[in-house]
UniProtKB/Swiss-Prot annotation:
Domain note: Binds ubiquitinated proteins via its RanBP2-type zinc finger.
Species assigned in the record: Rattus norvegicus
Keywords, comma-separated and alphabetical: Acetylation, Chaperone, Cytoplasm, Endoplasmic reticulum, Metal-binding, Nucleus, Zinc, Zinc-finger
Quaternary context: Heterodimer with UFD1. The heterodimer binds ubiquitinated proteins. The heterodimer binds to VCP and inhibits Golgi membrane fusion. Interacts with ZFAND2B; probably through VCP.
Listed name of the protein: Nuclear protein localization protein 4 homolog
């Protein structure tokens, strides 16, 4: 009998020992490997070196002896999905997480950037504690990992939640390199396809039954900071409450960037706030269907922006003479109500965080919640939040309800004949100081909330131009602020900057040019949006010479507002006679009338 040898084969699932002989062919050996690891014949590749060089092919003429494979050698197995090199996978994350993940999804640019960063916290030599030379390192100056809790707790202010990418580094650290860890999304639903019994409510088994959920305070957050580019963005949003006293809602449009104050942190920079159709009162908000939502997202994308969160006001005036507001959200009441947590969870489920380390291709969300409310000094403060991944799962699977009389409490639904709901628990401290487990009926929503710092920069940033007479914001008809060609003509007449790009760089103006019903420019505005995105005045001037802008100026001239550069209300190069032969907008109802008429066809009021 030929001398037996043992070959070790390392795979993403661990190391196994294969018994073989020196004269055994490579093809026979690979069949043993496939059987041992449970692969099909072509479902894997085996290499002599870890860097995927020296592949062992299924040859019937080459023996292990000819391949110089000896007793005790270590070979490396890679499944087919991991066999090819990928630039996205060249990070410090573990092979284990990659094996469980979805390698074909495209992550956000900020995630791709941070995954390639070192992330370690470098410290200089301590002159009092370090006893070595300038080139040496010791425990007092060696670089720290980005998830070091002691370092985060001693920051000013202390950081309660590590960044998401620091959390990934923590999972992939240690001896096993995260081999047995997967970023799996929580499911509160019964698994479908179980044929061993009747469907719920007539039957259930341990295979299809979702596990009970014990709520824990999440140790990480997907976004570490919310920053408004300048005060004007926030002040214009607050103007609605200042003028009406009613609460207001808006979507935050901006971009995700690196937050350098926290290791591997992410910041949501807000460049504009879009206000959808809504009905607001002093203590409630109702969102209406928005037919322009997809167009707004498309325009924002062409401007290099995306929807990064939502904002709402909760302001009650305390002293109108001093301009103070009531301080109502604090540790003695609540920071987010249960209804607001459910709304935030719904928004986060609609905007998932693309993640290649999750089998589903997504994990958590970077969608943030901002609240304009009263602070301890009775001035308007902006607070930022997210809800945990556990809350997202409870909201997605319709397991969480708000409490009517206690906004600080939620309620986990009970199972019914239509829906099975797993038990939800949370841990608390009783009056004797003992840790006890409580059923989440009711549930303090503080277990679901993650707070995020909200800031303004010392040096303001301006993605869009700031004007003393800005263009009206959409959906503010209750204030008498309407977006029409009369307001456009007024805006253009008051903003006489010689730089056309500065005049046209207004988020709400660009939305009006695309979404107005008289002259929508959705198919011809791409060049202008590119000019605004890149701050290119030449591109803006090129678009200004187009027929579309000439038509816009012609429509503005019919509403009776003198535009700079136009002669006697005529279009470019036109005259007053040309204006009278064009369509004109009624100053009372904005209806576009046919040329030659003296009264509006809609409201019957005179033209002048």
């Amino acid at each position: 009998m030929a001398e037996s040898i043992i070959i070790r084969v390392q795979s993403p699932d661990g190391v196994k020992r294969i018994t073989a002989t020196k004269r055994e062919t490579a093809a026979t050996f690979l069949k043993k490997v496939a059987k041992e690891f449970g692969f099909q014949n072509n479902g894997f590749s085996v290499y002599i070196n870890r860097n995927k060089t020296g592949e062992i092919t299924a040859s019937s003429s080459k023996s292990l002896h000819l391949l110089k494979i000896k007793h005790g050698d270590l070979l490396f197995l890679f499944p087919s999905s991991l066999a090819g090199p990928s630039s996205e996978m060249e990070t410090s994350t573990s092979v284990g997480l990659k094996a469980f993940g979805a390698p074909h999804v495209v992550e956000d640019e900020i995630d791709q950037y941070l995954s390639k960063q070192d992330g370690k916290i470098y410290r200089s030599r301590d002159p009092q504690l370090c006893r070595h030379g300038p080139l040496g390192k010791c425990v007092h100056c060696v670089p720290l990992e980005p998830f070091d809790e002691d370092y985060l707790n001693h920051l000013e202010p202390p950081v309660k939640h590590m960044s998401f990418h620091a959390y990934i580094r923590k999972l992939t650290g240690g001896a096993d390199k995260g081999k047995f860890v997967a970023l799996e999304n929580i499911s509160c639903k019964i698994k479908s396809g179980c044929e061993g019994h009747l469907p719920w409510p007539n039957g259930i088994c341990t295979k299809c039954q979702p596990s009970a959920i014990t709520l824990n305070r999440q140790k990480y957050r997907h976004v570490d900071n919310i920053m408004f580019e300048n005060h004007t963005v926030a002040d214009r949003f607050l103007d609605f409450w200042r003028k009406t006293g009613n609460q207001h809602f808006g979507y935050l449009y901006g971009r995700y960037t690196e937050h350098k104050d926290i290791p591997l942190g992410i910041r949501a920079e807000v460049a504009a706030i879009y206000e959808p159709p809504q009905i607001g009162t002093q203590n409630s908000l109702e969102l209406l269907e928005d037919p322009k939502a997809e167009v707004v997202d498309e325009i924002a994308s062409k401007l290099g922006l995306r929807k990064v969160g939502w904002i709402f006001t909760d302001l009650v005036s305390e002293d109108t003479r001093k301009g103070t507001v009531r301080y109502s959200r604090n540790k003695d009441t609540y920071f987010l109500s249960s209804e607001e947590c459910i709304t935030a969870g719904d928004f986060q489920n609609k905007h998932p965080n693309i993640c290649r380390l999750s089998p589903d291709g997504h994990f958590g969300s970077k969608f943030v919640t901002a609240v304009a409310t009263g602070g301890p000094d009775n001035q308007v403060h902006f607070e930022g939040y997210q809800v945990s991944n556990q809350c997202m799962a409870l909201v997605r699977d319709e397991c969480l309800l708000p409490c009517k009389d206690a906004p600080e409490l939620g309620y986990a639904k009970e199972s019914s004949s239509e829906q099975y709901v797993p038990d939800v628990f949370y841990k608390d401290i009783d009056k004797f100081g003992n840790e006890i487990t409580q059923l989440a009926r009711p549930l303090p929503v503080e277990y679901l909330i993650i707070d995020i710092t909200t800031t303004f920069p010392k040096d303001p940033v301006y993605t869009f131009s700031i004007s003393q007479n800005p263009f009206p914001i959409e959906n503010r008809d209750v204030l008498g602020e309407t977006q029409d060609f009369h307001s456009l003509a007024t805006y253009l007449s008051q903003n006489t900057s010689s730089v056309f790009l500065d005049t046209i760089s207004d988020f709400h103006l660009l939305l009006f040019l695309v979404t107005n019903e008289v002259m929508p420019l959705q198919d011809s505005i791409s060049l202008l949006l590119e000019a605004v995105r890149t701050r290119n005045e030449e591109l803006a001037q090129t678009w200004k010479k187009s027929e579309q802008w000439a038509t816009i100026e012609q429509l503005c001239s019919t509403v009776g507002v003198q535009l700079p550069g136009l002669h006697e209300f005529g279009a470019v190069g036109g005259s007053a006679r040309a204006a009278t032969s064009a369509m004109w907008a009624c100053q009372h109802c904005t209806f576009m009338n046919q040329p030659g008429t003296g009264h509006c066809e809609m409201c019957s009021l005179p033209r002048t």
